[in-house]
Amino acid sequence: LAKDTRKLFDPKDDAVLTYLDDDGRSIEPEFYMPTLPTVLVNGTEGIGTGFSCYVPPFNPEDIKQNIVNHINNKPFKPMKPWFRGFKGRVFEDEGGGWVTEGIWQVIGTTVKVSELPPGRWTQDYKEYLDTLVEKKLIGSFTNNSTTEDVDFLIQGYSGKDIIKDLKLQKTIRSTNMHLFHPSKGICKYQSAEEILSDFIGLRLEYYKKRKDQLIW
């Protein structure tokens, strides 16, 4: 385990978790109860029986501040998706979704791309640019990217819509956030703030269980 894992999964919760049984042997808990909702910190994506889910990651500092706001009877501040190390923009579109946008610079017919939207990898992007060379939408390109930085120099671009042609934006929809709640079952959430609200309610239940255990 990473050294900070036990800050997220407090040892004081161990005694109040419900542990599963495997042939008379106690194994892992039915679910863990972290101090921050890891589904919002890490994001998640998957397909289950009859349901699919996509939740983007959010900034742990924003999540923490909204928990403090709740404790102080203040409203949540809207949170936007956040990707560690991403240097581009994240903004809300007119349909209520989110758009991630890379970074580029245009000099005549040359385009320097120094950041791609999250989830768009440099190898895949290189292969995509190869198809644009075949279509004669660009003349050539050089890939100087490293494991740390994106660096594509695209020459001879002749298109009309640089963002669409060079795939410099990616849309994130928040209409498919299906998650399993321990007492409610499968729930469809409309926002990250709604997920956080349910988490806080459950987290408070477990603080109460810890308190009751100390008393009794």
Segments predicted by a language model, with ranges:
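Short beta-strand elements
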Residues: 5, 37-42, 97-106
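Charged, surface-exposed alpha-helical interface/stalk elements
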Residues: 73-216
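Conserved glycine-bearing catalytic or ligand-binding loops at nucleotide- and phosphate-handling centers
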Residues: 1-4, 47-100
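A short, contiguous, amphipathic alpha-helix enriched in charged residues
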Residues: 1-27, 113-137
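Active-site-proximal segment of RNA-dependent polymerases
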Residues: 12-39, 76-98
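Long insertion/accessory domains within large nucleic-acid-processing enzymes
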Residues: 18, 22-56, 61, 65-68, ...
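Generic, well-ordered alpha-helical scaffold segments in large soluble proteins
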Residues: 3-8, 39, 54, 63-70, ...
